[in-house]
UniProtKB/Swiss-Prot annotation:
Keywords: NAD, Oxidoreductase, Tricarboxylic acid cycle. NCBIfam families: MalateDH-SF1, PRK05442.1. Belongs to the LDH/MDH superfamily. MDH type 2 family. This is Malate dehydrogenase. The active site is at H190. Substrate binds at R95, R101, N134, R165. One of its GO terms (molecular function) is L-malate dehydrogenase (NAD+) activity. One of its GO terms (biological process) is malate metabolic process. The keyword Cell membrane does not apply. PANTHER family: MALATE DEHYDROGENASE.
Length: 329
């Protein structure tokens, strides 16, 4: 007997990331090869965007995915999020020429306040929300604060792209396979301030830090390369990273829903006060996932260099939070 279909809402569905994401969800890569899905796709109520969305839906139809039960197009979050089991909030206002970061925050605060309220009112009470649209941590915080009837733990931000970028750099440096590297952590904000930390990482039970044994590389090459990778891709491609972001979103939700099999993964989640991070801030931490729940890895030692890096990315998150405080009243 087949499982009941899961409803997956995706915002910004006709955008670059959406285009790289939807076909993989429909093929079963995110929720499992035996899990039927209904896609509820949201785009802005603009004729051009809605027309583009219709084209994407035509292509989804033309793939004849056995797991794809239904696809609907929406311009209103209140219909797009109806009974959603998973919500991928991909659409956000990008930073335009001459726009200050605070302008970006206030424009996105309006979008994510409205989407948080809609989730609060119409989504499944167990909805799993992943915010991909930047600034992802603060957008997730805004949505969470706008949805008081939903558990705060349902709201997460995507740090998995940073995690995967760090994995790939470490594999290249150490000559080891990506799949063999375990216990990598990325702390903080999804921004260049984030702190990729391989002090606990292992390869085949051996310490990766001891194997690499290069503090200067860690400080001067590894951390900045991971932090500025998005900008490097824009510089090379002329467009932001879409396929790798979509891939990270698939990884994040797949592990959250189906479990990480004991492996550490990075998720931006509401802080419980551990690691000196104020409660409620959406901050990247290591977690393991099982039975649809994530559990933070606790008790990791924070040395002086790491404390400095954790506080540096926290400072940015607190500034962002304070920048949107008045908009959340």
């Amino acid at each position: 007997m087949s499982k009941p279909a899961m409803r997956v809402a995706v915002t910004g569905a006709a955008g670059q990331i959406g285009y790289a994401l939807l076909f993989r969800i429909a093929s079963g890569e995110m929720l499992g090869k035996d899990q039927p899905v209904i896609l509820q796709l949201l785009e802005i109520p603009d004729e051009k965007a809605q027309k583009a969305l219709k084209g994407v839906i035509m292509e989804l139809d033309d793939c004849a995915f056995p797991l794809l039960q239904e696809v609907t197009a929406h311009s209103d979050p209140r219909t797009a999020f109806k009974d959603a089991d998973v919500a991928l909030l991909v659409g956000a206002r990008p930073r335009g020429p001459g726009m200050e970061r605070k302008d970006l925050l206030s424009v996105n605060a309006q979008i994510f306040t409205a989407q948080g309220k809609a989730l609060n009112d119409v989504a499944s009470r167990n909805v799993k929300v992943l915010v991909v649209g930047n600034p992802a941590n603060t957008n997730a915080y805004i949505a969470m604060k706008s949805a008081p009837d939903l558990p705060a733990k349902n709201f997460t931000a995507m740090l998995r792209l940073d995690h995967n970028r760090a994995l790939s750099q470490l594999a290249a440096k150490s000559g080891k396979a990506v799949a063999d590297i375990e216990k990598l952590v990325v702390w903080g904000n999804h921004s260049p301030t984030m702190y990729p930390d391989y002090r606990f990482a292992t390869v085949g039970g051996q310490s990766l830090a001891k194997l690499i044994n290069d503090d200067a590389w860690n400080r001067d090459t590894f951390i900045p390369t991971v932090g500025k990778r998005g900008a490097a891709i824009i510089e090379a491609r002329g467009l932001s990273s879409a396929a790798s972001a979509a891939n990270a979103a698939i990884d994040h939700v797949r592990d959250w829903v189906l479990g990480s099999n004991g492996k550490w993964v990075t998720m931006g989640i509401p802080s419980d006060g551990s690691y000196g991070i104020p409660e409620g801030i959406i901050y990247g931490v290591p977690v393991t996932t099982e039975n649809g729940e994530y559990k933070r890895v606790e008790g990791l030692e924070i040395d002086a260099f790491s404390r400095e890096r954790l506080d540096f990315t926290l400072k940015e998150l607190l500034e962002e939070r304070d920048g949107v405080k008045d908009l959340l009243k």
